[in-house]
Amino acid sequence: MPDSPTESYGPDREYHVFISLFLCRNTSGKFLSVGPATPGWSINNTVVKENYYTEKLSCIITFNTLNFLTATISVVGTAGNATVLRLLGFHMHRYAFSVYVFNLAGADFLYLCTQTVYSLECVLQFDNSYFYFLLTILMFAYLAALCMIPAISTERCLSVTWPIWYHCQRPRHTSATVCALFWAFSLLLRLLLGQGCGFLFGKYDYYFCRYCSFITTAFLIVLFVVPFVSSLAMLTKIICGSHRIPVTRFYVTIAVTVLVFTFFGLPVGIISLLLPRIVVFRGVFYIYKIVTFLYSVNCCANPIIYFLIGSIRHHRLQRQSLKLLLQRAMQDTPEEEGGVKGPSQKSNELEIV
C-alpha cells in the first residue's frame, strides 16, 4: 500500500513494494511492528488514531499467526520428508519412480527447512542480511519440486500408453538424468530472476526482471498443465483402453499427490506470477502468506500420503514398518491375496536408474 494517497507506482516504487512482501518489511525497509508510529499522510490524527492502531494491531496479529502456523507445519513436514529421504536413500532399492519421489522429497525438505527459518525470522524480527538468500532458496526449491510432479505423471503415462517401448527401449538412468537437469534448470532460472530483480548481488533492472519473469511464467504454465494432461491420458487409457489395466497402489499415490498439489501447491505459484501486477492492491500480502502456508501443508502432506496409502490393505488400515508402507505405496503391480507381489514387481525394484 502506498505511504501517501498521492504516491504513484512507477517501476521503482512497484519494485520496493514487491520486495517488501517477501522481506516482512514495510516499504521504508523496516520490519512490521506495533510500536508507536503515525500514518504517513497529513490528516486529522485525533480522528483516525484509534482506528489506525486497532487495524495495525490486527494486521500484526494475523501476520504473526500465519508465520507461526507455517513454521509449525514446516517442522512437521521436515521430519516426514527426512524419513522418506532416509528410507529411499539407504534402505530401499532404487528404480524409476522412486528416484523421482526421492528428489521430490529432497525439494520439499529443502523448502520446509528454509521456510521454517524464514517464518521464524519474520515473527522474531531478526534484522539480518540473509532474507534475500532465504528467498532465493525458497523459490529454487519450489521450482524443483514443481518439476518432479509432472515428471512422475509423464513417466507413468508413458509406461501405460506405450508399455513395450517403455520397458524395452527406455534409456537407463533416465530418471536420474531428468532430475539432475530439473535441479540445474531450476537453479539457473532462479539465479537469473534473482539477479535481475535485485534479490542477489546485482542491482534491480526493471526490464531484465520483466523478461526473466516472463520466462518463469511460461515455464510454470507448462509445469501446471503437464500433470493434468498426463493424468487425463492415463485415466483415459485405464478406463477406455482395449485391454483392462488394473489400478495399482502407485496409480492411487500419483492421483492423490496431484490432487493435493492442485489445491495446496498451485496457488502459491499462481499468486507469485500475479504479484508484480496485483502488488498495489490492499491485502495481497496476506493472500501471499496464506498460499505460502498452503504450500507448506502440501509438502507436509506428501509423506503422509505415501504412508497412508501403504497402510491400507484390503480396505483396512494396518500397522507396519515405515519401510514396508513406503514400498507398498509405490507398488506398481496389482496386490494379490496374501500380500504376494506380482511377477514384475521384483524386477522393477531391482531396476537401478
Curated annotation (Swiss-Prot):
It is found in: Membrane. Expressed strongly in newborn dorsal root ganglia, adult dorsal root ganglia and trigeminal ganlia. Glycans are attached at N26, N44. Residues 1-67, 118-131, 202-213, 275-289 are extracellular. The chain crosses the membrane at residues 68-90, 97-117, 132-152, 181-201, 214-234, 254-274, 290-310. Belongs to the G-protein coupled receptor 1 family. Mas subfamily. This is Mas-related G-protein coupled receptor member B5. It comes from Rattus norvegicus (Rat). The gene is Mrgprb5.
